[in-house]
UniProtKB/Swiss-Prot annotation:
HAMAP family: Ribosomal_uS5_B
Alphabetical list of InterPro entries matching this protein: Ribosomal_Su5_D2-typ_SF, Ribosomal_uS5, Ribosomal_uS5_bac-type, Ribosomal_uS5_C, Ribosomal_uS5_N, Ribosomal_uS5_N_CS, Ribsml_uS5_D2-typ_fold_subgr
Domain S5 DRBM stretches: 11-74
Domain of life: Bacteria
Tagged with keyword Nucleus: no
Pfam families referenced in this protein's UniProt entry, alphabetically: Ribosomal_S5, Ribosomal_S5_C
Protein name from the UniProt record: Small ribosomal subunit protein uS5
GO molecular function, one term: structural constituent of ribosome
SUPFAM superfamilies: dsRNA-binding domain-like, Ribosomal protein S5 domain 2-like
Length: 166
């Protein structure tokens, strides 16, 4: 029991969407619920998951478990991203640009949830193409996964960080 309480304190969860879906059978419709949840520690780790169940709380619980299994580490520089990036998934894309301290998170709906739970405090973003919540979340995660900090770039080029900036 103590371990479960510890886990819930480690990550903050945010329900992005809950959708009622129907399966048409001979006797009528059978309804189920799908939940899209984003979890993060506001310190560079974020993930998302989907869950489906007969009841909403059960769907959310399944989505949270799925999200915790699929976490991404996000490089951050003073509360923002190291560089501009566009994340793509399907026909949806999310453009993210670093912002000056004090700007805040300028993002809509699902993108805002991912960025805030990743611990990013200042960023400008624009969603383009598909505005389906799951595609927007996946495009945002894709962009965050493709971010590289100065140390990674220096290592790839076989140089020191100082040589990059000269």
């Amino acid at each position: 029991m103590a371990r479960r309480e510890e886990e819930t304190k480690e990550f903050e969860e945010r329900v992005v969407t809950i959708n009622r879906v129907a399966k048409v059978v001979k006797g009528g419709r059978r309804f189920r619920f799908t939940a899209l949840v984003v979890v993060g520690d506001k310190n560079g780790r974020v993930g998302f998951g989907t869950g489906k169940a007969q009841e909403v709380p059960e769907a959310i619980k399944k989505a949270v478990e799925a999200a915790k299994k699929d976490l991404v580490v996000v490089p951050r520089v003073e509360g923002t991203t190291p560089h501009t990036i566009t994340g793509r998934y399907g026909s949806g894309s999310v453009f993210m640009k670093p912002a000056a301290p004090g700007t805040g998170v300028i993002a809509g709906g699902p993108v805002r949830a991912v960025l805030e739970l990743a611990g990013i405090t200042d960023i400008l973003s624009k969603s383009l193409g598909s505005n389906t919540p799951i595609n927007m979340v996946r495009a945002t995660i894709n962009g965050l996964q493709n971010l590289k900090n100065a140390e990674d770039v220096a290592k790839l080029r076989g140089k020191s960080v100082e040589e990059l900036y000269n």
